[in-house]
Amino acid sequence: MRNRIYIEITNRCNLSCDFCHGTRRPPRTMTPAEFETLALKLRGETDYLYLHVLGEPLLHPQLPELLAITHRLGFRTCLVTNGTLLPRQKDALLSAPGLHKLSVSLHSFEGSAQSGDMTAYLRGVWDAVLPLSQKGILCALRLWNEGTAQRCNAEIINFLSNQIDQNAEALPQDARGNRTLSPNLFLERAERFAWPDLSAPET
């Protein structure tokens, strides 16, 4: 049995991050019928479905329906998001019975050169992940930009520290260097993700 399987429910995204190579494919969103057909074929192959490859999953107009399908079929569902749409989708995620984990790529703010208010962005993320984590959903705040300029990291860490009333970077680390901000809510640090080069020779 595979540890996890990724399904791209949409290749549309509302950002253009420098760490993502994007796609030349036409914009496409998987229908609930297509999704259920695929999910049925994956039963017994894995317990965990990650609804993300390229694209922003929170852009899917029928995301609650997809999450209901995964729950009905017995999967544990994980989402990876840039976080910009969390204020809009928070209630839908809170009511989704099959959501197991939500990962938020905080480094997308810097990676996409967003010109908006970072504090407002972080507030929108925090106001979503806090009640989700309190409900028992695992929430990971990702800073996967080790080895890059990290221009926004100090402001992000300062914001998180203010929310928990202690220095987030002084919290104990696990074996992977991650820190627990509160129950079910984690800060993940890692090197910048490198997308596989499909044209590179096999090694």
Predicted regions and their residues:
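Conserved alpha-helical substructure of the radical SAM core
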Residues: M1-L102, A113-D117
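Radical SAM enzyme [4Fe-4S]-AdoMet core and its adjacent flexible, acidic
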Residues: M30, L73-R76, A96-T203
